[in-house]
Design a protein with these regions (language model features):
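Short amphipathic, positively biased membrane-proximal segments
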Residues: 1-175
Length: 175
């Protein structure tokens, strides 16, 4: 019998699906959570990459401010639906960014991760839009109030995703 060691491959697929789902719900939340993680747990896979900016603490702070601003702006009556093409494109790009950065950090293909993240973000956009509008119509609850619940789900989901990631080293400070 052979004595072989099984090589443990770092998780790539499911974390991207998680981050991209966040991007479909709130476009800036996924990059904010991922950059927060990378700023505390830098990965050699991003060294020398155009995506290395995601590891900078200033990037993490700026993305958190933008994510908070998006959550406020989402409740305004003039905010367009997430499924119109320009807004949908932003969510696709956000999902592609987190997918590419995560795959690259795990020494994978940034292109493959970007495609996966972008497609998952688009799917999550349509699902979350249908859920939000459906809940609002079925319960006669204002869409903005349902949006507050969606914000809570995004924050809780992002925090759970970060806690679930296998940590490479050092002390972890979730938020």
């Amino acid at each position: 019998m052979k004595n072989s060691k099984k090589k443990i491959r770092p998780a790539k697929f499911w974390p991207v699906i998680g981050f991209a789902t966040l991007a479909g719900m709130r476009s800036m939340s996924a990059p904010a959570f991922l950059s927060h993680y990378f700023s505390r747990q830098p990965h050699a896979g991003l060294d020398g990459s155009m995506l290395r900016f995601m590891q900078k603490p200033l990037t993490a702070k700026a993305l958190k401010v933008m994510a908070a601003g998006e959550m406020v702006a989402d409740k305004l009556p003039t905010t367009p639906d997430r499924i119109i093409p320009p807004v949908l494109l932003g969510r696709l790009l956000s999902g592609a960014l987190v997918g590419a950065a995560w795959y690259k950090s795990r020494h994978g293909s940034a292109l493959g991760g970007g495609v996966l993240g972008g497609l998952a973000a688009v799917a999550a956009t349509f699902v979350s839009y249908a859920l939000r509008t459906g809940i609002s119509m079925q319960t006669a609850t204002p869409v903005a109030l349902v949006g507050v619940g969606e914000d809570a789900l995004v924050v809780a989901g992002g925090a759970a995703l970060l806690r679930g990631l296998q940590l490479a080293q050092g002390e972890w400070r979730p938020m």
